[in-house]
Regions:
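Binuclear metal-dependent hydrolase catalytic cores
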Residues: 1-124
């Protein structure tokens, strides 16, 4: 089995507290980062773990509760400010996340230097 690292950025709370952050994890596999959920404050925790934003190209949102996706628009904006050019893929149940985020991206991240590709994962 191939070695991978799992970074627990937040778990155990829908609300940020002094001891717990809302859910977000990063899997480090084959020199690539895969994020599972992106809660409020996630990008600060990524920096604290010294993970490179440039290695993150895939984000998976488990379900559409705010504590699992409120950090996305800030992270997308930060990527643009850092000069990102590679595509970012975001996977989520159904098409609702793109419907919610696309207007925010168009408004807050107008002229972004990279493409965000949404993938709707069908409900079972």
């Amino acid at each position: 089995m191939e070695k991978f690292d799992l970074h627990i950025l937040g778990c155990g709370s829908a609300l940020p507290t002094q001891k717990h952050f809302p859910p977000s994890q990063v899997v480090d596999l084959r020199d690539k980062l895969f994020m599972i959920d992106c809660a409020e404050g996630t990008q600060l925790l990524v920096r604290k773990q010294k993970l490179k934003f440039s290695r993150l190209n895939h984000i998976f949102i488990s379900h559409l509760h705010g504590d699992h996706c409120f950090g996305l628009i800030g992270l997308l904006s930060t990527f643009d400010l850092l000069g990102r050019t590679s595509k970012l893929h975001i996977y989520s149940p159904g098409e609702d996340l793109e419907k919610l985020l696309r207007p925010q991206i168009d408004y807050f991240c107008r002229g972004m230097g990279y493409e965000v590709v949404f993938h709707a994962v069908p409900h079972k």
